[in-house]
Amino acid sequence: MSSCINPSTLATSVNGFKCLPLATNRAAIRIMAKNKPVQCLVSTKYDNLTVDRRSANYQPSIWDHDFLQSLNSNYTDETYKRRAEELKGKVKTAIKDVTEPLDQLELIDNLQRLGLAYHFEPEIRNILRNIHNHNKDYNWRKENLYATSLEFRLLRQHGYPVSQEVFSGFKDDKVGFICDDFKGILSLHEASYYSLEGESIMEEAWQFTSKHLKEMMITSNSKEEDVFVAEQAKRALELPLHWKAPMLEARWFIHVYEKREDKNHLLLELAKLEFNTLQAIYQEELKDISGWWKDTGLGEKLSFARNRLVASFLWSMGIAFEPQFAYCRRVLTISIALITVIDDIYDVYGTLDELEIFTDAVARWDINYALKHLPGYMKMCFLALYNFVNEFAYYVLKQQDFDMLLSIKHAWLGLIQAYLVEAKWYHSKYTPKLEEYLENGLVSITGPLIITISYLSGTNPIIKKELEFLESNPDIVHWSSKIFRLQDDLGTSSDEIQRGDVPKSIQCYMHETGASEEVAREHIKDMMRQMWKKVNAYTADKDSPLTRTTAEFLLNLVRMSHFMYLHGDGHGVQNQETIDVGFTLLFQPIPLEDKDMAFTASPGTKG
């Protein structure tokens, strides 16, 4: 293993930026988030040569190193951990006491949406297996669209084959689906996102429910109940449950579940404790990663690039939120932070000659070549990447006696080469056709790299056959990465075109077909929905070499892309929606009511 060099010790002539005041409250955050990137030219001098470069004028991170180091949570205390373990035992007993199929399905749905399902996987598997094996006994869901849809969604989610024909009884040959019950319509809408290619009934279900949910949003009045119906309809239309990362749903659903009259107090208390305990873990991880970032000197020396450490951590938390994946989150966060810097070099700052040399340096993986040929600012970036990848490979070798250095180097090189293709398109003012753009874009969006990193850092033991499958660019990686690419383009293309970047999928489709931007955007959205049907089929394939954990890493990456780019560029520009979610997920614990705190004095007193 090559020795590591500290990039922070290398000199560079890039000027640093003056940081904005630290934002620690929502009001200050909203003011800072209004700044948008614009294009301008800056002149820099390297090796006595002055080079005119583009600059995106990205704003500094909302949360700096000192703020992250100041984080402190009470939920690391052993008292909370003991209470959580006690509650888990009681919930397991309560699960056994639930015997009616619909009640069992609703309990599973609540466990999933509260972020608790991973604690009760054996119990959930047993219930779903039993329901699937006795599906001919369907009186409990007969003429109940809500129950039928819930069963369909949960069984398909967990890999059980269910025919779309279960919905035939809710259709009329002439008018289609018949239902005016909001609960049933919402449940059917969520189920429709688990459809497969060629399922006409499920496609009709999506069209029917989308139309009615939009109407419910428009016709709702100011009554509290109607306002909540409109909110649920809006959330389902924006982002269905199947497209949401677990932790993102949990924070909202805990708040909703607390207001329900039928809530289970054990579940609610456990969900709050679980959320706050995980948040405390995340804060400690952020402190450590922020220290790493500061030590590299990249944020200080490469002032043209984005410091998006907290956003990078949000990605990693969304991909692998469970506590046992701490190392996976660390590797993913650092990788995404480095990807962000390299992306800015290729998209904005580097000259084409420099980019070709950097690509060659990554291909050679030769430190002497890099130090000899790269300009100063690129040496910083290459050394940070080189050191980190080698340390990652060494850790896995030490822990598992598995040499994955070639695999991870190859994955990084694929990304860098895709970046270079887009840089050449930009410099030659070339607009590719949509399919040509997507074939390169599914790599440049980082999908194959992030999936490979997730697997190598989150799997023990690493299975050679599974790794080789991921490296072969299988269809599931292909289509997942294309969805990621398209969602990114929907959220970022306006800002990036304003900067003069390479055309994105929307512009490629407009150029190719003559369509308006509005039509192009609707086409891209429909493409994503159809691609999800392909992904659904691959994840349900019993013969797939992917483990359930690896498949969830992959799905959660796509889900996080939907969140990050739903309201714009949540990663690069730090839009308000992403900032608010980041604040509540990472820095704002859920208050426990006084009665919930009764266990502090005597953990065994609360039932």
UniProtKB/Swiss-Prot annotation:
Inhibited by 2-fluorogeranyl diphosphate (FGPP) and 2-fluoroneryl diphosphate (FNPP). A motif (DDXXD motif) lies at residues 343-347. GO terms for biological process: diterpenoid biosynthetic process. Its EC number is 4.2.3.20. It catalyses: (2E)-geranyl diphosphate = (4R)-limonene + diphosphate. Mn(2+) 1 binds at residues 343, 347. Mn(2+) 3 binds at residue 488. Changing residue 565 to F: 50-fold decreased catalytic activity. The keyword 4Fe-4S does not apply. It comes from the Eukaryota. Its main location: plastid. This is (R)-limonene synthase 1, chloroplastic.
